[in-house]
Each structure stands twice: as C-alpha cells, then as structure tokens.
Amino acid sequence: MKMKKLGALLLAGGMTMSTLLTGCGNGASGSSAGGNASQTESGSNGERKKITILMRASETSAKYIIMKKLLTDFSEEKGLEPPEFELISGDADYVTKLQLYINSNTLPDIYGCANGALSAAAKDIGGIVNIGDELERVGKKDDMNAAVYDFFKDKDDGNVYLFPEALNCEFFFYRKDIFEKYNLEAPTTWNEFLDTCKTLKDNGEIPLIVAGKENWQLMRYLSFAPWRMTKDQFIMDYIDQKATFSENAAAKEGADLLYTLGTEGYFQGGFLSTDYTAATDLFFGGNGAMWYSGSGQITQASEMYKNGQLGFFAVPDVDGQENMETNVPIHGGFGTAFNAKTYDDTMKEFFEYMCNHYSEGCYNDAQVFSPFNDEMPEGLDQLFYDLQPLFENATDAWVSWDDKLDSATLTNIVDEQQKLAQGKETPEEFEAAADQFIINNSK
C-alpha cells in the first residue's frame, strides 16, 4: 500500500508512526490469526481447515458472544477445526493491528471494521465483500432494519460492505415520578424540552444528567438539530467547506441548544468531569430527571422500568423547522467485514447460516436488538418490546460527527464545545471558531 494511504489510516485512527510500529501486540487475547489468511486456514490439499476472525471485542462483548456460538456450531456441522479468534479490546491497538493486516494483505476471513478510512483501504486491496449483494443472495436484505442498513452505506459508492453487530438505538430516559410531581409530559420539541428543564430547575431538581467528560455526549446535543433537519448534509458540507456554522440554520440551532443547557444550569454540577460510568450511576442511582441513554442500558434500567419509575422519549423536533421522520438515533455498532480473497463456498454457506440464526444469538445469548426485523422471542425484558416501535419503521440512520471529522478538527471542536457549554463563549463565537477550524486544518 502506498504511504499516502497509510498516512490517511493513521490520521483516521489518531495514531503516530511509532504507535504503528510498537503497538501491534498490545491488548490482544485469544489465538493469533497471523500470517497469510489462505495459509492459516487451508490444508496442503487446499481445502479449508478453519475460519479465522479478528474482533475489536472482549469475551464479554455481545458481538463475540454471538459470533462465537455461530462460528463454533457451524464449524462443528461442517467438520472444520474450531474457529480461530483474535480479540483486541482497545480501540487504538485494534486499529493498529487491522492496519497491519491491510497493509500486508493478510486479512483473516472475518474482521471488525469501521465504515470509513479502514473499510475504504480494505476495498482498495480487494479485501472486503459486498454485504448488500450477499444479503440479496440469501434473501435477507429486505428483512434488515432499513436504518441499520443505511448506517453502513459507503459514502463513495452507496454499497454496504459491513454487517452490523446489532441494532443500537438511543433515546432519553426520564423519571416518571418527578415528571408527575410537576405535571410534566415527555417533550416532543426542543422548546418543550427546555421548558421542562426550567420547571425542574426552578423546583430544585437536576433536569439533565450528562457525561460531559465524554466528548461524544456533549457533541450529541450539538448535532441533534443538524441531524433532524439535514441528516448528514450539514456535516458533510461543513467538511467540504460548502457550509458554515455561522450561516447554517441547523448548526446554529445545535450551538444554541448546548449553550442554553450548559449556561442555564440544566446539567448536573461538575458535568465536565463526569464520565459515562459515573453519569450512569448518578441517574440510575436516583439523581436527575432525564438522561440520554440507549438500548445498551436496558439491563441497568430494567428494575426501575418494571416498577413504573422510568419512561422514555425520542429526540425532540426542532421547533418551526422541517424535521425528518426518524427521531431515534440508530446505528449498527462496529461493522463486521468478510475478506473477499478468502470468501469461498464455505464462507458463503456461513454467511447464509449467520443471517438465518443471527436474531437467535442477539436475543437469546447477547440480549441486544437484532439488526433483522425478525419476531422477538418471548421472555425478554419488557423494555425490548416497548422500545421496538421507536425504530421498527425507521429508514434513516444516525450520523455521528466524531467519525466524520478529521482528527484535528474534531479535537478543536471538542475543546470549543466545552467552552460553549460553560458559557465561556457565546454561540456566535463558537460558530466563528468552528468555521475557522475546518479551513485551518485543510491547509
């Protein structure tokens, strides 16, 4: 691979050259799938011996739990050796290892991959299967949730090269007892949301818990309005320098929202030093009236929801603006890719087997939503059944800014959004600064 491509990958992973050279072994557990994939999986007669897989996961991760059972059962049925897993839990270490496999053209049969620079690099070497075509082949394309499928569409050609790990959806939990105390209803617009926050604060309640130490949490509030109003148009136009925060109505709505939430005291005290674990403990421990959460916290919410203490609502509409119909951020997690160079008949059989049994693994083994619109089994937590109507007909995926922006601009905006939330600058000052970041970092 050319050094230009390598440099792009390093930038996408936030890595340095020294990290690339020294970090490839850190954080690995399980067997190694090193060497040329065709050599490690085939015998002397060329017949496949086993299936190799690289995952950004630990042994407790939902994706590992699902794939471990599927691959093990399939391998036993086909008389193959047990599947060979290589697990790396750290993000930076995983990116490093995947880059090495791509650069040396030795990708395993199956590997985890983000939709962006890494999937593009795998596509450049012919190392990634068109998942959309394969879903069509096995008759499962129309069974997949449309928003999850949309999440993995390639920005260059519109094809889908990654299989979702699950259907993940995000929404707000709220304390029903607190809302009832002040005769409040779940807000459907941001003006209603802010009015609710004001009522709660005026009565001595903490309106909203936020994990302000996590960059993505504050950025959600910055990007909610642009997402509801433009989907990905604003952020992509901003990156291409075709749109600015200062002149885009959706972007200005987002900046105003974050500024108001922070400066009016609607977040908990010390929110910038609160990480996700601490914020979770605060809310489910009885602090705060609202919390931006998601399907990954069904377990934590289960008892309170069963006792009638919790309700949920979707991302509110932007008042006076045209909002897209989808109002629940939906994404497919870290994608799964199949190596086109080792995608033989056995792997094609496994893909079909995986699609036909994936929902079972999601619900029975991992307790997550399936990316397929299959009927849910009985006996799940009630939240699974009650949340499903939020997304079952959704067509548009969530658009996350933190995996679209270059690393320098992302760092700049993260620093600036903290100033905005603290009231150290006005929305107009934030917008002007953000507009300059993309110009400076493109030089």
Residue spans for each PLM region:
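Conserved N-terminal structural module of periplasmic/extracytoplasmic solute-binding proteins
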Residues: A8-L9, T19-A120, D124-I125, R137-G139, ...
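Extracytoplasmic/periplasmic substrate-recognition and gating elements
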Residues: K49, T72-D73, E77, E81-E84, ...
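Extracytoplasmic/periplasmic substrate-binding proteins
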Residues: M55-R56, K63-L71, L118-A120, D256-K341
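Conserved C-terminal helix/tail region of periplasmic/extracytoplasmic solute-binding proteins
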Residues: P82, E180, D202, A340, ...
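Extracytoplasmic/periplasmic solute-binding protein
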Residues: D157-E165, E170, L194-A243
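Glycine-centered hinge/linker elements that transmit conformational signals in sensory
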Residues: T199-L200, D240-F271
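A structural signal for short loop-to-beta-strand junctions that line the ligand-binding cleft
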Residues: L100-Y101, P108-D109, V138-D177, I206-I209, ...
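Hinge/lid segment of periplasmic solute-binding proteins
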Residues: A114-F171, E185, L194, Y221, ...
